[in-house]
Swiss-Prot record:
It comes from Homo sapiens (Human). The keyword Cell membrane applies. This is Transmembrane protein 204. It is a multi-pass membrane protein. The gene is TMEM204. Its main location: other.
Length: 226
């Protein structure tokens, strides 16, 4: 059985979502923070970097001699206090921890959906394109990714006065929308197939059967493809 174009398109959309999700995770441009002394820095899920103060025409005040202040970065992890510097540390720490967890779960779900598609192409009995659970498994994986990304992004609905959302956050919003689109395409395809199969079988009886005293005639019938 050849893979339908709609299924292949949904998997391709989910692959783009997976790429955008990883790009957003490993860049340091999730939010931009401004400190009281005028310095600015960009904070990501796993690292933060100081930014050059171009308005002053020189290096940032916190730069030390012999170091490039444009990318003076530090790694972040679970429960990092640095992400909440200048803001309510408890709130910001919870926001980033929640987003890290949701990002990892979404990456795992999108990857599982891609592997399910590839294993179906190989021809495994349980995950073959002929199996009814093949598309359902991919749709469930993509929908899970969309759901957890929404949960993580909602935590950034309220941010402090010194913090602004940056382009990595909007990139992750795009990944969430693409994952939702991929799941919706598969769900629509599944429901469309079921509607076709729920139609009653069409049986056309030959007119010759109505003739009297004639035997041995076979039924001429046409059944639905399901």
């Amino acid at each position: 059985m050849t893979v339908q174009r709609l299924v292949a398109a949904a998997v391709l959309v989910a692959l783009v979502s997976l790429i955008l999700n990883n790009v957003a995770a490993f860049t340091s441009n999730w939010v931009c923070q401004t400190l009281e002394d005028g310095r600015r820095r960009s904070v990501g899920l796993w690292r933060s970097c100081w930014l050059v103060d171009r308005t002053r025409g020189g290096p940032s005040p916190g730069a030390r001699a012999g170091q490039v202040d444009a990318h003076d970065c530090e790694a972040l992890g679970w429960g990092s206090e640095a992400a909440g510097f200048q803001e309510s540390r408890g709130t910001v720490k919870l926001q980033f921890d929640m987003m890290r967890a949701c990002n990892l779960v979404a990456t795992a779900a999108l990857t599982a959906g891609q592997l399910t598609f590839l294993l179906g192409l190989v021809g495994l009995p349980l995950l073959s394109p002929d199996a009814p659970c093949w598309e359902e498994a991919m749709a469930a994986a993509f929908q899970l990714a969309s759901f957890v990304l929404v949960i993580g992004l909602v935590t950034f609905y309220r941010i402090g006065p010194y913090t602004n959302l940056s382009w990595s956050c909007y990139l992750n919003i795009g990944a969430c929308l693409l994952a939702t689109l991929a799941a919706a395409m598969l769900i629509w395809n599944i429901l469309h197939k079921r509607e076709d199969c729920m139609a009653p079988r069409v049986i056309v009886i030959s007119r010759s059967l109505t003739a009297r005293f004639r035997r041995g005639l076979d039924n001429d019938y046409v059944e639905s493809p399901c």
